[in-house]
Swiss-Prot record:
Phenotype upon loss of function: Slight reduction in plant height. In cell wall, altered content and composition of lignins derived from typical monolignols.
Superkingdom classification of source: Eukaryota
Name of the gene: CYP93G1
Protein name (record): Cytochrome P450 93G1
Cellular compartments annotated: Membrane
Family: Belongs to the cytochrome P450 family.
Record's bilayer topology term: Single-pass membrane protein
Record's catalysed reaction(s): a flavanone + reduced [NADPH--hemoprotein reductase] + O2 = a flavone + oxidized [NADPH--hemoprotein reductase] + 2 H2O + H(+)
Species: Oryza sativa subsp. japonica
InterPro entries reported for this sequence: Cyt_P450, Cyt_P450_CS, Cyt_P450_E_grp-I, Cyt_P450_sf
Binding residues annotated for heme, in chain numbering: 454
Pfam families reported for this sequence: p450
Length: 516
């Protein structure tokens, strides 16, 4: 029989082994926690978060203001967790410049939400396409042809027709009745953008497209738990995916009709080589039919690009015109200077247009000041594809990168009395002379900067101030209660005014110039 000692020896050995394993496990856990803690310390500063939802409970609309308030406490580069999505927020020109100048290649992607993916035809367009040869081809096509200076100039008559239609409508309104300028500007902007995209479509298609553009903006701008909370992914708890699928089906049918009308018109004009008659759809179809093109455009590419242009260009232009009119009406001295400049340059016998803009520096300064205070896209949105080291912090791959353009435009480090509407700051001696909104000056980038900067910037810089010039030249506008216009912001992808702009319009020009 074995002795007790003999029996205890293996048990003692087992205990020693288990103890060693336990000690090793403790060491592994401690090291893991320490490494994670070290990693967290290397992330930008962050407020306290909650399980599952992260910092979602801290966000109040409009989000750019919430980010601005958090940055005042945490600094110009901070980390937030929106559910299971990690994000960094840049709130100063210096941080934005470092991100774009030093790390552009690593933040050239744009995150695609569940709803946006449907309208983007799975990244077939331009706005959400991954950085790739296809994206680079579309970028060149945009900047050189689709939205380049030549095309913008050739399509000026389309925009002028939309403006004339708006002026006619306002002129026909009884002076005792208020004009819903918000509604009319959206209608004008939508119609102009759709006509620039496809000039041959009948009015019934244009009207349906206007309705769908509005719904798309609402769906894409809505908070969707599927995008942020991993537990909700794939369940479509809010029904946004189902609604988006239905709207996408309708929009796809409409786009097919637009393309069919265009193809029929092109068949009738096979011998027409007049480049000046081409709209955006013509240019896209030309590229699709070009066997020597660097990238072969598919029908989905064409439809996705048209949706990109129509949805991005409509509401933003209307919102900027409305903000600029509201700011000038709330600042009578600036309004007086704009009108005096227009009368000195244009006179009272014709209506101001885009061709007058180079000789209207105060009007353009007022537009820049509006862009500084009220950028239509207050947050530039990117996504990292690789880890970034910036200012001693680590930004992991697959992190959403937000640049708070709205906050940067109000930074007192760059702008004297930053909350004041003062167009003079962009004129000689004003401190901002030579500062342009084209993305090279990081303290002022209402159209973004770098590879993902807004391709429609040139169009916006032409169309918006021209519409404002005509509205202010032709009419005296009066608030219904003779008070200052409310400047509260709505929540959504586009930073628009929250309440409709209802104004009485009184013609200023007698006789009224011909509307041509």
């Amino acid at each position: 029989m074995a002795s007790l000692m003999e029996v205890q020896v293996p048990l003692l050995g087992m205990g020693t082994t288990m103890g060693a394993l336990a000690l090793a496990l403790v060491v592994v856990v401690v090291v893991h926690v320490a490494v994670n803690a070290f990693g967290r310390r290397r992330l930008p500063p962050s407020p306290a978060s909650l399980p599952v939802i992260g910092h979602l409970h801290l966000l109040r609309p409009p989000v750019h203001r919430t980010f601005h308030e958090l940055a005042a406490r945490l600094g110009p580069l901070m980390h937030v967790r929106l559910g299971s999505t990690h994000c960094v927020v840049a709130s100063s020109a210096e941080v934005a410049a470092e991100l774009i100048r030093s790390h552009e290649a690593k933040i050239s992607e744009r995150p695609l939400t569940a709803v946006a993916r449907q309208f983007a035809y799975e990244s077939a367009g331009f706005a959400f396409a991954p950085y790739s040869p296809h994206w680079r081809f579309m970028k060149r096509l945009c900047m050189s042809e689709l939205l380049g200076p030549r095309t913008v100039e050739q399509l000026r008559p389309v925009r002028r027709a939309g403006l004339v239609s708006l002026l006619r409508h306002v002129l026909s309104q009884p002076e005792a009745e208020a004009v819903d300028l918000t509604r009319e500007l959206i209608r004008m902007s939508n119609t102009s953008i759709i006509r620039m995209a496809a000039s041959t479509v009948p009015s019934s298609v244009t009207e349906e497209a206007q309705e769908l553009v509005k719904v798309v903006a609402e769906l894409v701008g809505a908070f969707n738990a599927d995008d942020y909370i991993a537990l909700c992914r794939g369940w479509d708890l809010q029904g946004l995916g189902r609604r988006a699928a239905d709207v996408h089906k309708r929009f796809d049918a409409l786009l097919e009709e637009m393309i069919r009308h265009k193809e029929e018109a092109r068949m009738r004009k096979k011998t027409d080589t007049d480049v000046g008659s081409k709209d955006l759809l013509d240019i896209l179809l030309d590229k699709a039919e070009d066997g020597a093109a660097e990238v072969k455009l598919t029908r989905d590419n064409i439809k996705a690009f048209i949706i990109d242009v129509v949805t991005a260009g409509s509401d933003t232009s209307a919102a900027m015109v409305e903000w600029m009119v509201a700011e000038l009406m709330n600042h009578p001295e600036a309004l007086r200077k704009v009108r005096e400049e227009i009368e000195a340059v244009v006179g009272r016998d014709r209506i101001a247009g885009e061709g007058d803009l180079p000789r209207l520096p105060y009007l353009q300064a007022a537009y820049k000041e509006t862009l500084r205070l009220r950028p239509a896209a207050p947050i530039a949105h990117r996504q990292s594809t690789e880890e970034i080291q910036i200012r001693g912090f680590r930004v992991p791959a697959q992190t959403a990168v937000f640049i708070n353009v709205w906050a940067i435009g109000r930074d007192p480090a760059y702008w004297e009395e930053p909350l004041e509407f003062r167009p003079e700051r962009f004129l000689a001696g004003g401190g901002g002379e030579g500062v342009e909104p084209r993305g090279q000056h990081f303290q002022f980038m209402p159209f973004g900067s770098g590879r993902r900067g807004c391709p429609g910037m040139g169009l916006a810089l032409q169309s918006v101030p021209a519409v404002v010039a005509a509205l202010l030249q032709c009419f005296d506008w009066q608030c219904m209660d003779n008070k200052l216009i409310d400047m509260e912001e709505a929540d959504g992808l586009v930073c628009a005014r929250k309440h409709r702009l209802l104004l009485h319009a009184h013609p200023r020009l007698h006789p009224f110039p011909p509307l041509l």
